[in-house]
From Swiss-Prot:
Gene: APOE
Quaternary structure and partners: Homotetramer. May interact with ABCA1; functionally associated with ABCA1 in the biogenesis of HDLs. May interact with APP/A4 amyloid-beta peptide; the interaction is extremely stable in vitro but its physiological significance is unclear. May interact with MAPT. May interact with MAP2. In the cerebrospinal fluid, interacts with secreted SORL1. Interacts with PMEL; this allows the loading of PMEL luminal fragment on ILVs to induce fibril nucleation.
Ranges for region LDL and other lipoprotein receptors binding: 155-165
Region (Homooligomerization): 259-310
Name of this protein: Apolipoprotein E
Length: 310
């Protein structure tokens, strides 16, 4: 495959055979240059186109490849790759189309299928021409093949022009299809926006209507709560004053009772003193008399003893 692509590059640089009209080939080559940087299916079609240009050179290497089945296999692989990329791109566009009108989607899909079928038929025709040329070339081995080359070259040139025309038609239809998708998406977005706008405005109105009573209720509830807190504070202050007064009353009563108890104790002490004081005085007097008697007795006793001894 690398050898084929190297030969392709050399062929593109060298140009076509002398029996091919140069000016139309240059124009077609310029037309196909833009396909190299497009969508994946366009790039695949460009590779098919370049392979066809290489086959059209009818060089000795190409004749050897055509006598084998490799050229047909390569061409078949490029055809399948191109049609696969076309189907993939078409499926992506259909997926992007979304909820577009079914009638429009069916019509556009039908047009794309027709253009896709024409492109596939053109590539199939190219492959059949190459198979026919290989059969005729094998039958004419050793004979002059100039007439066969000229006929194949003419057919391939016409097929390339038709292939370019059908490819451009498919490209235009896909572009229209994609533009329709964008317009449909924009219309859907605008329609959705128009439908949602009244709902958004209504929601804003309802929110404002709901928020006002809620705010009023919150303010009323806050006022009631403040009133209750103030009432509780006032009641607590009054209760504290009552408790303070009760404490003062209890303190006064306790002090009064303490004074009464002190007075009673003093009175009782006075009564006890009045009771026992005469007794104490009498006992003290008797005790003094007893002491005096003892002293007198003790004082007279030594005097009598001393007189007896003398």
């Amino acid at each position: 495959m690398k050898v084929l692509w190297a030969a392709l590059v050399v062929t593109l640089l060298a140009g076509c055979q002398a029996d091919v009209e140069p000016e139309p080939e240059v124009q077609l080559g310029n037309e196909w240059a833009k396909w190299q940087a497009g969508q994946p299916w366009e790039q695949a079609l460009g590779r098919f186109w370049n392979y066809l240009r290489w086959v059209q050179t009818l060089s000795d290497q190409v004749q050897e490849e055509l006598l084998s089945t490799q050229a047909t296999q390569e061409l078949t692989a490029l055809m399948e790759e191109t049609m696969k990329e076309v189907k993939t791109y078409k499926a992506q566009l259909e997926q992007q189309l979304g909820p577009t009108a079914q009638e429009t989607q069916a019509r556009v899909s039908k047009e794309l299928q027709a253009a896709q079928a024409r492109l596939g038929a053109d590539m199939e025709d190219v492959r059949n021409r190459l198979v026919q040329y290989r059969s005729e070339l094998q039958a004419m081995m050793g004979q002059s093949t100039e007439e066969l080359r000229g006929r194949l070259n003419s057919h391939l040139r016409k097929l390339r022009k038709r292939l370019l025309r059908d490819a451009e038609d498919l490209q235009k239809r896909l572009a229209v299809y994609q533009a329709g998708i964008r317009e449909g998406a924009e219309r859907s977005v605008n329609t959705l926006r128009e439908r949602l706008r009244p709902l958004v405005e209504q929601a804003a109105t309802v929110r404002s209507l709901i928020s006002k009573p809620l705010q009023e209720r919150a303010e009323a509830w806050g006022q009631r709560l403040r009133g209750r807190l103030e009432k509780v504070g006032t009641q607590a202050g009054d209760r504290l004053d009552e408790v303070r007064e009760q404490v003062q009353e209890v303190r006064a009563k306790v002090e009064e009772q303490a004074n009464q108890m002190r007075l009673q104790a003093e009175a009782f002490h006075a009564r006890l003193k009045s009771w026992f004081e005469p007794l104490v005085q009498d006992m003290q007097q008797k005790w003094a008399e007893l002491v005096e008697k003892v002293q007198l007795a003790v004082g007279t006793s030594p005097t009598s003893e001393s007189s007896e001894k003398q």
